[in-house]
Amino acid sequence: MAVQQRRVSKSRKGMRRSHDHLTISNTVACNECGKALLPHRACRDCKTYRSIKLSIK
């Protein structure tokens, strides 16, 4: 196994991890009930997708 040659400072560790943050996903409003949901997903409350009623069992 590899062993580190030098200790990694807090600053260097933070700089390496600077791109690891999570991004906030965009939300859109449902056309029927107006509830916020992820794009390209069916609404769980009114069971519609792009104003088309779905028959979910």
Curated annotation (Swiss-Prot):
InterPro entries per UniProt: Ribosomal_bL32, Ribosomal_bL32_bact, Ribosomal_zn-bd
Signal peptide region: none
Keywords: Ribonucleoprotein, Ribosomal protein
Annotated PANTHER family: 50S RIBOSOMAL PROTEIN L32 (PTHR35534), LARGE RIBOSOMAL SUBUNIT PROTEIN BL32 (PTHR35534:SF1)
Pfam families associated with the record: Ribosomal_L32p
GO CC, alphabetical: large ribosomal subunit
Descriptive protein name: Large ribosomal subunit protein bL32
Gene: rpmF
